[in-house]
Amino acid sequence: MKLLVFAGSTRLGSYNRKLARETAALARERGAEVTHLELGDYDVPMYNADVEAVGTPPDVMKLKQVFYEHAAWIICTPEYNASYPALVKNTLDWLSSPVKGDPVWNDDFRFSRGKVVGVLSASPGALGGLRSQSHLIPLLLNLHCWVAPHTFALGRAGSAFDEQDKLRDDTARQRIAAVVEQTLWAASRLQPESAATK
């Protein structure tokens, strides 16, 4: 099963990037074919219809294909002002924008339709980003994704990782593994392998 894991942050010491690395490792242990994506590796401007009218940026086209090729995604989202960050919204806005005149990418939801998505978050606060999840999940549903019922929010993230950026708490690791397992299980049933590799 092809699984895409990414964090909604580009900060060097981001808790959610650390969480994404841990999640990717747990998924590989469970037999998934994991792509750990760093959004900072792609040059994606703020969405602007005037920019789009000139031509969809090349890195947006690359991301469309990457997201499409994976049957399942796991998103590790920060929480900014009780919601998800602009990086996540901007990425999904670009990916869901049809490419006029392109027979493949003229469908808004080609990249996302039927994808199974697991949602994780990490935050220095006690709630661990739960409010971010509560805003992100409706967006994913609007993109015709199936969101795994199991989620996990890592609170007090500033002290949750050791010097090697590994989680200190086995219980947290088990909760993340539960999200991974449910996401992979659902994807194996809801997203035919052929559709994820065309």
Go through each PLM region and give its residues.
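Cofactor-binding loop segments of dinucleotide-utilizing enzymes, especially the Rossmann-like FAD-
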Residues: G8, L39, A122
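Glycine-rich phosphate/pyrophosphate-binding loop and the adjoining helix
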Residues: M1-L4, W146-K198
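N-terminal beta-loop-helix "entrance" segment that forms/cooperates
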Residues: L39-P57, A160-Q164
